[in-house]
Amino acid sequence: MKILVSVRSVEEALLAARGGVDFIDLKEPSGGALGGLPVATIRSIVEALREHGNGVAGKLKTSATIGDVPMTDADRIAACVDAVGACGVDYVKVGIERVSQALAVLDMLARTAWPVVPVFIADRGLDAVHVAHACSLGFPGLMADTADKRAGSLFDAVGAPELKRFVATVRGSGKMVGVAGALRLENCALLSELAPDFAGFRTAVCDGDRTTALDPRRLQALVALMRGGAAMRGGAVVEAG
């Protein structure tokens, strides 16, 4: 399991990079579950990480969200994907709600020129048909996340059996699979049992709620705990919650 941490600025990105995470996810926490950053900010962060020596050409990977765009506005989703992808991130994350438009949006995303990772918003559960359809398309990976971070973690929103089926289905299709959603240090044991390829964190590494600044001590504690569990299980963890 690899570790993903969500950041909103160059300063936070460099802190996370120096802290030893595997993925740096670019988002605006105050803008919702997948709040998007301005394109100029995304580009600045990518350039700063390259200068730091951990850019997209290195081991450290970057992702960025397009923002909470309504699923009914496919044209806007496509335009946002193009704008974010052109900033040089490794992956473009797009939220997938449990709505009737999901299949058509997934088809559209699979035709873009960018490596898109659909993020299934799991507050009302995971739609097996939507997940299976995404697995049949050319995405590099899929994620499960939550929208309402105040309602608890992903494990409060979705039962363990359903999450295990999600991980097994995505992994069985040959894609990487990740989870996020207000994950905290106390969720690490459940993450170890679930064993996704990566887990995403924001809440766990902030000095307060997820909209406050990253706390270097909390980041260090998360990495130490996740690496310890990884060493025993032969894996590592990530957060984007």
Go through the PLM ranges and name each one.
Residues 40-45, 102-105, 201-241:
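C-terminal helical cap(s) of enzyme catalytic domains, especially alpha/beta-barrels
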Residues 35-104:
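Glycine/small-residue-rich loop that forms an oxyanion/phosphate-binding "nest" at active or ligand-binding sites
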Residues 23-34, 86-99, 143-151, 194-219:
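Glycine-rich phosphate-binding active-site loops on the catalytic face of alpha/beta enzymes
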Residues 121-162, 169:
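Histidine/lysine/aspartate-rich catalytic loop segments that bind and position anionic ligands
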Residues 37-42, 76-81, 128-133, 156-165, ...:
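Charged helix-capping and loop-helix junction motifs
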Residues 3-7, 24-26, 60-68, 92-94, ...:
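Hydrophobic faces of well-ordered beta-strands that scaffold small-molecule active sites
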Residues 8-19, 69-86, 125-134, 179, ...:
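Catalytic cores of alpha/beta
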Residues 84-137:
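Hydrophobic, well-structured mid-protein blocks that either form specific transmembrane helices
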